[in-house]
A protein has these predicted regions:
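Boundary/entry segment of secreted carbohydrate-active catalytic domains
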Residues: 1-22
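N-terminal glycine-rich anion-binding loops that anchor highly charged ligand groups
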Residues: 7, 29-42
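Short gly/ser/thr-rich secondary-structure transition/capping motifs
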Residues: 22-23, 83
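Alpha-helical scaffolding within the catalytic cores
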Residues: 23-29
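Enzymes and membrane/adaptor proteins characterized by extended Gly/Ser/Thr/Asp/Glu-rich
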Residues: 36-143
Length: 143
């Protein structure tokens, strides 16, 4: 079966969207089913509104439900992305029921490979448990 150019191009796209449930996300449903997008990126704050908790993230259970449903409507496995760097750049905040995530700068100052690995593993576990498989966290961040 041949895949149309439109659907091939769709695989190159990762789209943000508004809504915490699929019922609120008609645009992204169309992007996934009609255009075969490669993934989505999740945010907690809608910058136009400027208030935390107004975009895609409300709680760990809500987030897992959303990511499961997004995967279930897609023909292919979606990249489900987030910016969960820790410190100032964190989407999974304590106010939503997640643990505080220290910044990588703080972890670097500790200069302890065991703590660094534990921190990495902790972030990976939280993301995995929420159905998130792509973290746009910095590999190298110079301040």
């Amino acid at each position: 079966m041949s895949i149309s150019i439109k659907r091939k191009i769709g695989q190159l796209i990762i789209s943000g969207f508004r809504g915490k449930t699929l019922g609120e996300c008609s645009d992204v449903l169309n992007f996934i089913t009609e255009y075969n997008i490669g993934g989505v990126i999740l945010f907690d704050e809608d910058l136009e509104i400027g208030t935390p908790g107004t975009r895609n993230i409300e709680s760990p259970d809500q987030l897992k439900d959303l990511t499961d449903k997004l995967q279930n409507i897609s023909e292919n496995s979606l990249f489900i992305a987030i910016d969960q760097e820790g410190g100032k750049v964190t989407r999974l905040k304590q106010m939503y029921g997640f643990k505080n995530t220290p910044s990588w700068q703080h972890i670097g100052y500790l200069n302890n490979t065991l703590i660094t690995k534990e921190h990495s593993d902790s972030i990976a576990l939280v993301l995995s448990n929420c159905g998130i498989n792509l973290n746009f966290a910095p590999v190298l961040d110079i301040s």
